[in-house]
């Protein structure tokens, strides 16, 4: 049987194969371009010293430098160590700032990008067949569906909720990036190519592009003056001008009346031309949006059964619009009714391997499994007798949910404070975790022992997936794009949760140690100047033993 070195013979003694492998690794490294370059530089310096040591009198120059160093006062050593400590401290602070902002070490980045090519580039050894290159991995991760921005199915109302929060706290709950995505959504949902034929729709087309909220509201009133049945104008007023949910519901009811009338007209003539078909799609989007928001208004006003009925009717009437994730609104309303059998029926339909997952799907499934065992669950008892089948199923469901979105448990366990959810989320990211926990924390608290079971088991997921960026267990490897996108979606006063936690680069530890060591030397030099001078001379004798007699003579 051939060993790892390819000799085709058995090793003569135990451990010989390991020694041969180490020797082979050293030989390959010595054959690398950068190693050959270092050997060439060392050989050149040796030849330079051998050829020119007599003309240049290097030994005499070294002795002169040693004499100069031996005559320096303690103040010089103190100033030197203070300066070294200050410079290394500046480097440490800059490295820390660069790491916190960009997630990489500046020194390592410069070394890899600029210095490494100068000393020979990368090694020639081919990559392992099963591994992707860094560029391919990054491209694959960027192409994964988890890195796509999704509209938050449970997003709040700007006028009735987000604006009220800003009035009370003085903090802006939405980022410009998030609002810009919403503006793009509104243009896609509520406009079409035939808007130029209707003056009111032309005004609304401009309104959706406006950045100033007051300008948008003013444009909506202008559209209503031109056409009192402009459904999109009522939608804008309900979203942004209404300061209460009751006012928003009133506007949406007016939008529903106008939207149904326009939708029926579009249905009758949609086959006449592609423009009419595009208008029907737009009118369908408006009608679905209005009905969904009316159901959400009913949910917020306590009419939960009415809200559930409206959502079920909407899903039956427009089954092809499942990408709007109306089922997540339905799940939350059913959990509020504590209709757990109906929740399980919805999960059976949408928790399918062929459909996109979400935190709402995964954590609701885990909640139902935990509900069956949480009241009787005890870590001590489980440790003694082992887990039952139902407990194993609950723990596995929690591990599955945590693998999909590892940020959620800290919010459910109230280890991190919540903020208002953004209008868009990134699946598996902190933004999705905030949106889920904001609406579902009360449902976990309602089931006795569910949070206790989550607290005891959720961290076990990370032992199953030690390197989540490289390998997943039940899902794709965790995408690397979440942190950057979440920082764009979530407000600046919120501390974004990062997974996996990045280890501090080597040079941060190195500069911190160098700064501390030089500061300690400066303090010792200031307190014990004579002793530190003796120590410095001893170091010089160790570094340059040839010149030691001159050092002793000068001392």
UniProtKB/Swiss-Prot annotation:
CDD domains associated with the record: ST7
Q: How does it sit in the membrane?
A: Multi-pass membrane protein
Q: Does the keyword Ribonucleoprotein apply?
A: no
Q: What UniProt keywords are attached to this protein's entry?
A: Membrane, Transmembrane, Transmembrane helix
Query: Where are its TM segments located?
Result: 32-52, 76-96, 504-524, 531-551
Main subcellular localisation? membrane
InterPro entries xref list = ST7, TPR-like_helical_dom_sf
GO cellular component entries: membrane
| Protein localization | Membrane
Q: Pfam families of this UniProt entry?
A: ST7
All disulfide bonds of the chain are: none
Can you tell me which family this protein belongs to?
A: Belongs to the ST7 family.
Annotated protein name in UniProt: Suppressor of tumorigenicity 7 protein-like
Look up and give the organism this protein is from.
Gallus gallus
Gene name on record?
Answer: ST7L
């Amino acid at each position: 049987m051939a060993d790892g070195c390819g000799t085709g013979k058995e090793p003569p003694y135990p451990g010989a194969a390991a020694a041969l492998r180490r020797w082979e690794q050293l030989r390959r490294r010595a054959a690398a371009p950068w190693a050959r370059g270092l050997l060439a530089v060392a050989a050149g310096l040796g030849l330079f010293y051998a050829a020119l040591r007599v003309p240049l009198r290097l030994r005499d120059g070294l002795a002169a430098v040693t004499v100069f160093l031996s005559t320096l006062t303690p103040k010089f050593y103190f100033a030197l160590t203070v300066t070294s400590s200050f410079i290394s401290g500046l480097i440490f602070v800059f490295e820390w700032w660069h790491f916190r902002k960009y997630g990489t070490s500046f020194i390592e980045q410069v070394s890899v990008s600029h210095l490494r090519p100068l000393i020979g580039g990368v090694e020639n050894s081919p990559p392992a067949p099963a591994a992707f290159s860094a560029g391919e991995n990054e491209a694959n991760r960027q192409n994964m569906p988890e890195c796509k921005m999704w509209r938050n199915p449970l997003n709040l109302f700007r006028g009735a909720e987000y604006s009220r929060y800003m009035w009370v706290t003085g903090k802006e709950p939405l980022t410009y990036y998030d609002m810009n995505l919403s503006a793009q959504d509104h243009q896609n949902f509520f406009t079409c190519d035939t808007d130029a034929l209707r003056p009111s729709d032309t005004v609304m087309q401009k309104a959706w592009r406006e950045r100033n909220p007051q300008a948008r509201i003013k444009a909506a009133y202008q559209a209503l003056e031109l056409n009192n049945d402009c459904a999109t104008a009522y939608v804008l007023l309900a979203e942004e001008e209404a300061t209460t949910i009751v006012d928003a519901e009133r506007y949406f009811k007016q939008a529903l009346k106008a939207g149904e009338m326009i939708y029926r007209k579009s249905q009758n003539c949609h086959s006449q031309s592609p423009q009419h078909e595009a208008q029907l799609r737009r009118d369908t989007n408006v009608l679905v949006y209005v009905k969904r928001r009316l159901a959400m208004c009913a949910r917020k006003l306590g009419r939960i059964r009415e809200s559930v009925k409206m959502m079920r009717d909407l899903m039956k009437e427009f089954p092809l619009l499942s990408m709007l994730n109306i089922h997540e609104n339905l799940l939350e309303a059913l959990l509020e009714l504590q209709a757990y059998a109906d929740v399980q029926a919805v999960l059976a339909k949408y928790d399918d391997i062929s459909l996109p997952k979400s935190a709402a799907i995964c954590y609701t499934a885990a909640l139902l499994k935990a509900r069956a065992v949480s009241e009787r669950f005890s870590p001590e008892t489980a440790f003694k007798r082992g887990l039952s089948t139902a407990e194993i199923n609950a723990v596995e469901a929690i591990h599955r949910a945590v693998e999909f979105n590892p940020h959620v448990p800290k919010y459910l366990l109230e280890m991190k404070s919540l903020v208002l959810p953004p209008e868009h989320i990134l699946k598996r990211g902190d933004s999705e975790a905030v949106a889920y926990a904001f609406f579902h924390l009360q449902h976990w608290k309602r089931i006795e022992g569910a949070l206790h079971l989550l607290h005891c088991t959720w961290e076990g997921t990370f032992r199953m997936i030690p390197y989540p960026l490289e390998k997943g267990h039940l899902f794709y490897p965790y995408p690397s794009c979440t942190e950057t996108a979440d920082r764009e979606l979530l407000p600046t006063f919120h501390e974004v949760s990062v997974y996996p936690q990045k280890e501090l680069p080597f040079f941060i530890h190195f500069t911190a140690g160098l700064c501390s060591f030089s500061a300690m030397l400066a303090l010792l030099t200031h307190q014990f100047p004579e002793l530190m001078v003796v120590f410095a001379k001893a170091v010089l004798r160790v570094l340059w033993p040839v010149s030691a007699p001159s050092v002793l003579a000068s001392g």
